[in-house]
């Protein structure tokens, strides 16, 4: 697309970054100044009843800056990148029609990628094929199915852990239905995003600072009642660790503690480590992201001013 045709498209802002980088605080500040409406881009914030461990904006923050696509699923329900793209496009169209600018804020990079580039045309789920895969897993174990995936799609197998039955079964299901691997199909992008996008990423200048922020926030969550929040989910009886909601960072480790698999101290240690690993993956993804403007978490006023400098011209 030419620069001229891009300039005629409606505007949108991406505010990306690792966990605990200060994205929400910056987004709220920007909403005070720019004609923006916020859309959450976070695969954990979609779940109802999962507030403390996901660092969901609190009531005061949401009053100052309402976020769309929060609390739209029960933790027992699935939500895909395709679901997100559909919902986000609808929200963006609604915001644009009202003469305002969509500000998409979050750390789920797969969602940002799906929105920006479109999605490959993957086959729909097939209950019969899925049942056959699960039967084979019950008889032979998921390790056996992972070896099977390695034979047909080594790239996907390297990315998917043998203990991730949901993604493993989906990769095999796609192959059995279409005869093509998940890797082949995902190399074919769908429709690109019909917006002129200003992209920002916010993070601390050093890894050590980010690690400090992560550890501090995890302890803040514990002090705010994170254990009680997960106990309420645990007590429902219909949730388990195969669900994406319970595999969220922090929740998975607290679940193991509640099941008696690990001690409280081990839960804290693993929770902090898992959050650091998540942040590392997010930063790695962003380092390879084209056209992104980096902001420093430790200089929030400067970060705000840099965004305003880049997008200020679209505020009118």
From Swiss-Prot:
GO terms for molecular function: ATP binding; tRNA dimethylallyltransferase activity. Its EC number is 2.5.1.75. It comes from the Bacteria. Keywords: ATP-binding, Magnesium, Nucleotide-binding, Transferase, tRNA processing. It catalyses: adenosine(37) in tRNA + dimethylallyl diphosphate = N(6)-dimethylallyladenosine(37) in tRNA + diphosphate. Its cofactor is Mg(2+). Residues 42-45, 120-124, 166-170, 247-252, 280-287 are annotated as: Interaction with substrate tRNA. It is an enzyme of class 2 (transferase). Gene3D superfamilies: 1.10.20.140, Crystal structure of tRNA isopentenylpyrophosphate transferase (bh2366) domain, P-loop containing nucleotide triphosphate hydrolases. The record marks 108, 130 as: Interaction with substrate tRNA. The keyword Manganese does not apply. The record marks 280 as: Required for specificity towards tRNA substrates containing a purine at position 29. Residues 206-229 are annotated as: Interaction with isopentenylpyrophosphate transferase. Substrate binds at residues 19-24. Optimum pH is 6.5-9. Induction: By 2-aminopurine. ATP binds at residues 17-24. Strongly inhibited by ADP, ATP and other NTPs. GO terms for biological process: cellular response to heat; regulation of cytoplasmic translation in response to stress; tRNA modification. Monomer. Binds to tRNA(Phe). Catalyzes the transfer of a dimethylallyl group onto the adenine at position 37 in tRNAs that read codons beginning with uridine, leading to the formation of N6-(dimethylallyl)adenosine (i(6)A). HAMAP family: IPP_trans. Specific tRNA undermodification may be a switch to higher mutation frequency when cells are subject to environmental stresses other than treatment with mutagens. Belongs to the IPP transferase family. This is tRNA dimethylallyltransferase. It comes from Escherichia coli (strain K12). The gene is miaA.
